[in-house]
A protein has these predicted regions:
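FIC/Doc superfamily catalytic core
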Residues: 1-190
């Protein structure tokens, strides 16, 4: 006997799925892309404002997708299922490997409220002072702020693609007033 898996987001009633004019349209100009991106962020903001939504589950799932994208950037073959298994099957004292470490960075970054301390915990190879400096590099509207943080990190540490994307997502979340990092940018860059 098989059971249908419950879909907690569809049970909420508000808000419904992404409007078709956002998800089916193709941006032909920079203005279109800007508009559709803003509309998608606005819709996500409504989901994150809904108290009944499983925020931690959403962030964890997006963190897995972001880790998968970052692992692919580095040329590694691991995909979401292997990353998930690598993390969940770790025994005390085991090392997760490079791909597993990337996955852990994203999960740690998304699970705690935004702060330099939480980001330093998620990115153990980066000093808290450096995180604060990069975070402060972003000024302006939310997407511009995220882009400036990404640019600042990659100009100082060109091989730190995953940490750069984590910090850019943190800047975006902070600018939008979200209490937690929501992994969005890495999957979009892939």
């Amino acid at each position: 006997m098989t059971f249908a898996r419950p879909d907690p987001l569809s049970a909420l009633g508000t808000p419904s799925g992404t409007p078709s004019w956002i998800s089916s349209a193709r941006a032909e100009t920079l203005e279109d892309a800007t508009f559709f991106s803003g509309a998608a962020l606005s819709h996500l903001h409504l989901v994150l404002a809904c108290e009944e939504a499983p925020h931690a589950l959403l962030r964890d799932r997006l963190a897995l997708r972001a880790a998968e994208a970052c692992v692919a950037f580095s040329g590694r073959p691991e995909r979401a299922a292997e990353l998930r298994d690598a993390i969940h099957l770790l025994r005390p004292g085991d090392l997760p490997g490079p791909a597993g470490e990337t996955c852990l960075e994203w999960r740690r970054a998304a699970e705690r409220p935004l702060s330099v301390k939480a980001l330093a915990r998620a990115l153990p190879g980066i000093e808290p002072g450096q995180i604060a400096s990069w975070r402060d590099a972003g000024r302006g509207p939310p997407v511009t702020r995220a882009a400036r943080v990404l640019e600042a990190v990659l100009s100082d540490a060109p091989r730190a693609q995953a940490p750069a994307l984590v910090l850019a997502d943190a800047a975006l979340a902070q600018a939008l007033g979200w209490p937690h990092l929501v992994p969005l940018l890495a999957a979009g860059v892939a």
